[in-house]
Amino acid sequence: MRALISVYEKEGLIDFVKGLLDLGFDLVASGGTSVLLRENGMAHSSVEEVTGAAEMLDGRVKTLHPSVHGAILADLDKESHRQDLAKRSIVPFDLVVCNLYPFFERPGIETIDVGGPTMIRAAAKNHAHVAVVVDPADYSEILSELKALGSVSADTRRSLALKAFELTARYDAAISNWLAGGDSSEKLPKRITLTLERAAILRYGENPHQVGARYRQPGVRSWWDDARLLSGMELSYLNIFDTDAAWRFLHEFEGEPAVAIIKHANPCGFAMRSAIEDAYKTAFEGDPISAFGGIVAINRNVDVSLAGMILSKPKADVIIAPSYDDEALQLMATKRKNTRLIAAPVPERSSIEVRTIGSGFLIQDRDNFRVALGDFKVVSKAQLSDDQVLDVDIAWKLCARTSSNAIVIVKDKMAIGIGAGQQNRVDSARIAVEKAGDKVVGSVAASDAFFPFRDGLDALANAGVSVIVSPGGSIRDQEIIDAADEAGVALIFTGERHFRH
């Protein structure tokens, strides 16, 4: 039997080649692979010896030769193919082992592989006669099958071919998207080639009768790949969805210890304090009923003191933090066996959002904050105090991550009332005021979009809110400003809407 080996990633290769030689394989290797085998005293022929042509153009042309591709592509069931091989003294390959230049990790012209994908596609096309191995993780299985059967089975060859075409498809997609990203004339390219690989099978989807899985882009490492589930049940679809929202939202804030609580992808608690234990306690006080069974994100290490505070509060479905002390982890894992405890790195900022509409897609760039706090405009006669500036920032960011129509009320760096997902802004305001209770007096409220009429602002002002933040932009803006002046509240226009659906 005969094998062609041309790999960039050489992990596990020496043991694999040793196994092939022990099975009596005749080996042909290209470029750096040949050098490695020679250094390890492994018998083989170089591609140059087979083709009679030296590699050229700094290695860009090595295996693109009839003596190589004829040996890969020959359909040995056809007499004409066998005659062509005999006429040219070409010996067919039974096995092609190949992986690619690291374009996923280092995009660039010089990491665009040409010969590798060509060999892989040729071998995968001819999987009736050739086994193509593109993943070092398959080496041991291939050796075991060769030892047991004397050849690679048809079923295995087919599954290897599928993996090979998936690899070349992902590889080409990465190159296409990289080139498209270089065109600065359009914020969104005319074509987006999306390839995904399954990263995890989930217990179920949004509901128990639905199947679910987490996928990722090949070669693009998500923070989820480095997150560690330290205790508790496996994560469900909704656990991941809400935890992702909570962790990303918490990282909108820097500096002080902070805790965010998310339920059904909406904030229902938030607090910043000088001590993380106080932040945890205060975050739950904002809406303790909704917080039960929620996702709790913490931006500090969890020690025994914080673990004690966590155990004194309603049960969370998931707790995510940068790290946990061993004693704290053991305590919580014992007392709250079903709570999922996750240690996670800082989440990356993705540039686009993708949603499905039937068989099509909606794509937009991510809703980032483009207008800085310092550029907000106070449009009312009343002004806000210096100690309300941070509350304005918190309320505005909370509001942007809450389902529209959204009204968020904040006081002393704590969310005290959140009205989310209502079909009219007045109802959102009334819900937020009701949840805030007596704390509403002297608070800051934020609206994710403009007030179309003064009734929403009146509901907040009459309850005792002293500062209201809104994008502005309504044809009735002056009416809204007049209403704020009548009530004596400070009104801020940000100039930036943050609908969320």
Functional labels for PLM-detected ranges:
Residues 1-50:
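N-terminal glycine-/serine-/threonine-rich phosphate-binding loop
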Residues 1-5, 70, 93-98, 171-173, ...:
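ATP-dependent carboxylate/acyl-activation modules
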Residues 76-124, 376-386:
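Active-site/ligand-binding-proximal alpha/beta "capping" segment
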Residues 119, 126-139:
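Mobile "lid/hinge" segments at catalytic clefts and subdomain interfaces of large enzymes
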Residues 33-36, 50-57, 103-105, 118-121, ...:
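Short gly/pro/ser/thr-enriched loop/turn and capping motifs at secondary-structure boundaries
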Residues 27, 44, 130-132, 341, ...:
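Hydrophobic beta-strand scaffold residues
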Residues 137, 141-192, 313:
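Non-catalytic interaction/clamp surfaces of large macromolecular machines
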Residues 32-103:
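Glycine-rich nucleotide/cofactor/substrate-binding loop typically near the N-terminus or early
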